[in-house]
Amino acid sequence: ALSSAASDVYKRQGGNDSMDTVMKLDDYAKYNNSDIHFIGIPKTIDNDLMGTDHTPGFGSAAKYVAASILEVVHDSLIYQLQSVTIIEIMGRNAGWLTAAAALARNEYNVAPDLIYLPEVVFNKDKFLADIHEVMKRKRCVVIAVSEGIRDENGHFLDDDSKYAKKDAFGHVLHSGTGKLLESLVFKEFGCKVRSIELNVLQRCAMHIGSKTDLNESFVIGSKAIDKALENISGHVMGFKRLSNHPYEIDYISTDVREVANYEQKIPVEWINKEGNDITQELYDYLYPLIQGEVHVTYKDGIPSYYSCKHLEK
């Protein structure tokens, strides 16, 4: 039972499933005339929540993805061999994190050479043809691919994987897309092929967090309290983009019923016509979110974080 004696404000941080929880609790509270206020705070590296320009956590994860891609490029260029490196990145239905791989590009590096997102139908023959074209001008090909890419029938590439599992919410945990593509590429080209799955490292690399992301995360948490004190319940906090250059945002809130169980995917116009890269518009959207460095404290040569020993119980 809900009890206002325990708390007058309930704040839930998370993604789509967490916002669904906020909606259900708010509905229940209203039905029972409870005084508890329910406010949702976005927090997901997937960046797929409606009602906000982006989500806390995404900028830091995107920064890790971009930095990892750049470092993989440096490693691949050491060897005087024709090679293809496939990097599988999280994203079941939305390809925001995979798109962030493009941020690895700089004055001397154009990789990732190809980017494949779940918003676009994936065709194996075209995939191989794309690689062939890149090989005409480069020795080392680096590819970023979302774990959730689908074929023309809407099937995930790893649907038949023997390693398929489900999370606590019943969502299939996709793993194996990179390995499948690795086998496909090796069979076609016979060159050195390697697939890399960034997996959970994408969401826990605090040593390379985005300062912009952290700053906004602190503020939006404070704004959530302010919203509850305005006697508002059943809302989700969010960001409204005012400008890319210079980067400027405002803090807003949206009725949770317009957010829960919906997904914000990459607009098709932000993906190139070939379906194998992103546009400048998407790059400009992503770029500000990874800016600024987080300086962590080190102890005995490794980052010193708050103890999480209590979580082992």
Predicted regions and their residues:
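Short, conserved clusters of charged catalytic residues that mark active-site
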Residues: 1, 126-127, 219
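Single conserved hydrophobic/aromatic residue that forms the stacking wall/gate
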Residues: 1-10
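Residues within alpha-helical segments
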Residues: 2, 23, 103, 222-225, ...
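Accessory alpha-helical/coil subdomains and C-terminal extensions
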Residues: 12-14, 20-35, 39, 55-194
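Acidic, glycine-rich active-site loops and adjacent beta-strand->loop/helix elements
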Residues: 16-18, 43-47, 91-93, 120-122, ...
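Glycine-rich, charge-decorated loop segments at or immediately adjacent to ligand/cofactor-binding or catalytic sites
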Residues: 46-54
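C-terminal non-catalytic interaction/assembly regions of soluble proteins
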Residues: 159-313
